[in-house]
């Protein structure tokens, strides 16, 4: 009954009901690791593709990701409008002690199990259930059967897509939307994130990756015109999180210096957020030893701050470690996640990372939109990753499922909307009546 009531109240208390618009086609671009200041006013001067989208569309000040500010949790938050503790995708690495199964950033076979994905229904599954057609390119999870459904087409992620892969995906997506083979096309591109990790968020390599994306966007605008899609297609671009500098030389917290690793049943992830499962009888000892460690905070599950919307997740560990910005947690220096490169030397050290407190400035992402349903040359106030789902549902013309997003934060972006206030919710009498009918 409690779960049923939560689902009901989520729908009526945390999201608003409005009539779906007459749907147009929708192209969604997820640009991983794209920090909000990468397209500051100064940066836009040398980014003609992004500049044209901003001048002809909507740009929010920044997008605050869900906690933890990692990829998989926010992939699902963006596509469900729900916090991590609701949709259950709480990390890039997860462990289920009941089944002894692991989710390891989507690369191991067990990551494809419905166990991890069926906690909520993402937009592409809702559209498929409504007999819409969905084409997805390199999108993490598009290869998974979720709630018994798969997208119309999935070009599965195998390795980091190249700039040519990205350009080809955009071109093919536009062809699919034009021909009627697709109603929604969604493309994932990772190179900005990869270069930010390897070389740092301010590095020339990361800036080169951004310029390559900008070139594709410039072509995309022309391709939309060439296909006559200007009045039939909305395009939404967003990122999952930002990126900050890390310094492995002097900002690493080695757990082996404070506890015996033999006292841990399981450790998941390294970096800003690390999950620990102590062996039976060792929880209190490990907790008290780690409480004194500087530059990080150790939380027992029930004491995780409510503002993270994290602790109710069923895969959350008994102990969660959260590092201060720029610090990195690992079992030892030997276990740091070096990246493979041609030298095999210290150039393999990572220079950038994310996953920290989601309210930190460097964790902020982007949101841009352009098309017939969006205002032109409009700057919007900051939004949160849970808000993106509602705007996608609206322009796709489908009623959103119950979610944690705020309609009032996004309605201002739409043409013909003069007020930022959400539609009027059901009055209290009607709500009581529905509750009686629903639960009696």
Swiss-Prot record:
Keywords: Cell membrane, Disulfide bond, Glycoprotein, GPI-anchor, Hydrolase, Lipid degradation, Lipid metabolism, Lipoprotein, Membrane, Metal-binding, Phosphoprotein, Signal, Zinc. The keyword Phosphoprotein applies. Residues 1-22 form the signal peptide. InterPro entries: Alkaline_phosphatase_core_sf, Phosphodiest/P_Trfase. Glycans are attached at residues 100, 118, 341, 404. Zn(2+) 2 binds at residues 193, 197, 354. It comes from Mus musculus (Mouse). Homodimer; disulfide-linked. Homotetramer. It is a lipid-anchor; GPI-anchor. It catalyses: sn-glycerol 3-phosphocholine + H2O = phosphocholine + glycerol + H(+); a 1-acyl-sn-glycero-3-phosphocholine + H2O = a 1-acyl-sn-glycerol + phosphocholine + H(+); a 1-O-alkyl-sn-glycero-3-phosphocholine + H2O = a 1-O-alkyl-sn-glycerol + phosphocholine + H(+); 1-dodecanoyl-sn-glycero-3-phosphocholine + H2O = 1-dodecanoyl-sn-glycerol + phosphocholine + H(+). Changing residue 72 to A: Highly decreases glycerophosphocholine cholinephosphodiesterase activity. Loss of choline metabolism. Gene3D superfamilies: 3.30.1360.180, Alkaline Phosphatase, subunit A. Substrate binds at residues 32, 71, 92, 193, 241, 354. One of its GO terms (biological process) is choline metabolic process. Disulfide bonds join 142-154. Predominantly expressed in kidney with a lesser expression in brain and heart. In the brain and spinal cord, mainly expressed in the white matter. In oligodendrocytes, is predominantly detected in the myelin sheath. In the kidney, is predominantly expressed in the luminal side of the renal tubule in the cortex and in the proximal renal tubules. It is expressed in liver sinusoidal endothelial cells. Zn(2+) 1 binds at residues 32, 71, 240-241. This is Glycerophosphocholine cholinephosphodiesterase ENPP6. It comes from the Eukaryota. Disruption phenotype: Enpp6 knockout mice give birth according to the Mendelian rule and are apparently normal. Mice exhibit mild symptoms of fatty liver and are more susceptible to a choline-deficient diet and exhibit severe fatty liver phenotypes at the early stage. Residues 420-440 form a propeptide. The gene is Enpp6. Inhibited by EDTA and EGTA in vitro. Changing residue 154 to A: Highly decreases glycerophosphocholine cholinephosphodiesterase activity. Loss of choline metabolism. Its EC number is 3.1.4.-, 3.1.4.38.
